[in-house]
């Protein structure tokens, strides 16, 4: 007499879903993500198809062709794009939970900051287009409040605050690519404030009374690693010629970081065949920030804490930006671009979560890369392989 036994198929998709927020299906129902679906109305299959699109660098057409042949998900690429838009608020919701659980939040209690950034997206193939994707995320709640798509090359497409709408009281943080007088002046005229890494060749500094600001002589007064100082300064609005008050905040790097900075200068000298000046070597011994944030609310220590926090956030975004550079934009419409961005960020955080807890291994029975290095690229390969393997096991028998 044969005893009854259960027989189940545990796919790598089950492994991946185990790292989703616990109540993600209930959240999906609350967001009504399947509203209007006409063909495949399975939540898991739709999510699986979207994850393949977001993580594997496929176009919507390639994704739906692959999922249709495997029997996983039967729908058109147009319908999948509409599902992506519907899933956008769900990805946003889950991003907030994952991000808050993995990262230290704002250094100022109750303070919201806008992180401004851009990245180039090269669509695959010999005729693939290259775009520059400008986006703004509010932190710590991880809400995308603006996106803009431009050509990667041409006039007016570089990193600039002028690509973004600014509201009175906005506090923006950005890297040195945004350290330009016209962009900072634009934010100031709109009633906003900036905190940017100084690009000393792109921004002319003045004293509050309009004289030349002697940055080098100021920096020479900081002699100890970890020592920080600030000075009042101003920049000039290129349009009105009016002075915009601000501060220079500088902290001297550790001796190890200074050695690395000098080494980088030497590499630039070899690569570009020019000799950096002594002033360039000195400036690279410091982290230098220009800010228009209010001094009373944002003293020197707080400005440095904000920059340190922004640097930590940038590390968290590193994988996210590498995923943004991989794949096809769904459309050039902001609604679908935002959903695409939220989905990419969710994939990045999911991989980060797997790496953090399991060092990239999904399960004891599905660890096919033990002999490889544990680098970021291999983490992504594991994730991609798990998604594709999960598609393979759904292929119907003939």
List where the protein language model places each region.
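Single, function-defining residue in the core of a domain
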Residues: 1-57, 65-66, 75, 79, ...
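Helix-turn-helix DNA-binding elements, focusing on the entry/boundary residues of the two helices
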Residues: 60
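Short edge-strand/loop segments of extracellular domains
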Residues: 71
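Short Lys/Arg-enriched helix C-cap and helix-to-coil transition segments
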Residues: 89-103
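Long, charge-dense accessory insertions within large macromolecular proteins
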Residues: 113-118
């Amino acid at each position: 007499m044969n005893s009854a036994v259960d027989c189940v198929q545990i796919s790598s998709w089950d492994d991946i879903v185990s790292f989703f927020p616990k109540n993600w299906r209930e959240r999906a129902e609350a967001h009504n993500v399947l509203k209007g679906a006409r063909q495949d109305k399975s939540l898991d299959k739709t999510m699986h198809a979207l994850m393949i699109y977001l993580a594997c660098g496929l176009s919507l057409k390639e994704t739906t062709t692959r999922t249709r042949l495997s029997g996983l998900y039967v729908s058109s690429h147009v319908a999948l794009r509409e599902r992506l838009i519907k899933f956008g608020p769900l990805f946003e919701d889950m991003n907030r939970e994952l991000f808050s659980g993995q990262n230290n939040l704002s250094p100022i209690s109750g303070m919201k900051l806008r992180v401004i950034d851009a990245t180039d997206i090269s669509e695959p193939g010999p005729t693939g287009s290259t775009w520059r994707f400008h986006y703004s995320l509010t932190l710590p709640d991880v809400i995308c409040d603006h996106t803009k798509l431009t050509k990667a090359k041409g006039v007016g497409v570089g990193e600039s605050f002028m690509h973004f709408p600014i509201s009175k009281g906005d506090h923006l943080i950005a890297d040195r690519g945004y350290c330009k007088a016209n962009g900072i002046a634009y934010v100031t005229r709109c009633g906003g404030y900036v905190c940017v890494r100084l690009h000393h060749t792109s921004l002319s500094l003045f004293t509050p009374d309009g004289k030349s600001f002697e940055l080098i002589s100021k920096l020479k007064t900081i002699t100890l690693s970890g020592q920080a100082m600030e000075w009042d300064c101003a920049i000039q609005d290129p349009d009105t010629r009016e002075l915009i008050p601000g501060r220079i905040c500088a902290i001297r790097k550790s001796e190890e970081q200074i050695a690395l900075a000098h080494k980088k200068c030497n590499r630039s000298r070899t690569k570009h065949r020019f000799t950096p000046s002594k002033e360039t070597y000195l400036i690279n011994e410091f982290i230098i920030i220009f800010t228009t944030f209010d001094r009373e609310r944002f003293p020197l220590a707080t400005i440095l804490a904000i920059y340190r926090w922004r640097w930590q956030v940038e590390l968290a975004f590193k994988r996210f930006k590498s995923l943004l550079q991989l794949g096809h934009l769904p459309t050039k419409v902001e609604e679908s671009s935002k959903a695409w961005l939220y989905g990419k960020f969710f994939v990045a955080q999911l991989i980060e979560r797997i790496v953090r807890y399991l060092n990239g291994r999904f399960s004891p029975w599905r660890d096919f890369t033990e002999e490889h290095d544990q680098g970021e690229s291999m983490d992504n390969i594991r994730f991609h392989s798990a998604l594709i393997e999960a598609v393979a096991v759904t292929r119907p028998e003939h």
